[in-house]
Amino acid sequence: MKYLCLLLCFLSFGFSSAQAQSKTVPVSEAWAGNSVNAVVFRKNSLVTYKNIQFIAFYNQKGKLTLGKRKLNASKWEIVETAFNGNIHDAHNCISIMVDGDGFLHVSWDHHGNPLNYAHSVAPLSLQLTDKLPMTGLNETNATYPEFYKMPNGNLIFLYRDGRSGKGNLVMNRYD
């Protein structure tokens, strides 16, 4: 029994020392009047593509704000976009994803609103296109946007079209 306890102590020490150290990297000032930047149903507010990390949030003025940094860097490049979000409704979260070609895709400000979607003008860029439709169908009443990356780099975009209890799940594929 004594040896079993010693073995467990050594194993737990080995596992605890093998864990990666976490590091906090400040980004920028953001809206903090409610949970819109941190709601539990928010999907992909921080994504990594190769050695570049991207982040999206609403700043204190309610502007959709994007950032990127190299993984080991502590300084973020921050861009305030021309797009606004209703920061007073925590449903209006932002979702981002980078596709297999390095383009950043962004969806924001949805709580029964028309689809707000744009993507970067070039790979790894923080500059966005104007608002774009995806398919043009079922894009007038969107809530809960979520991007998912497929193993081949293509994207799946999900959202609810319609009201609570009377909506449909919409799934778009981006290739």
Question: Residue ranges of each PLM-predicted region?
Answer:
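Bacterial Sec-dependent N-terminal signal peptides
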Residues: 1-22
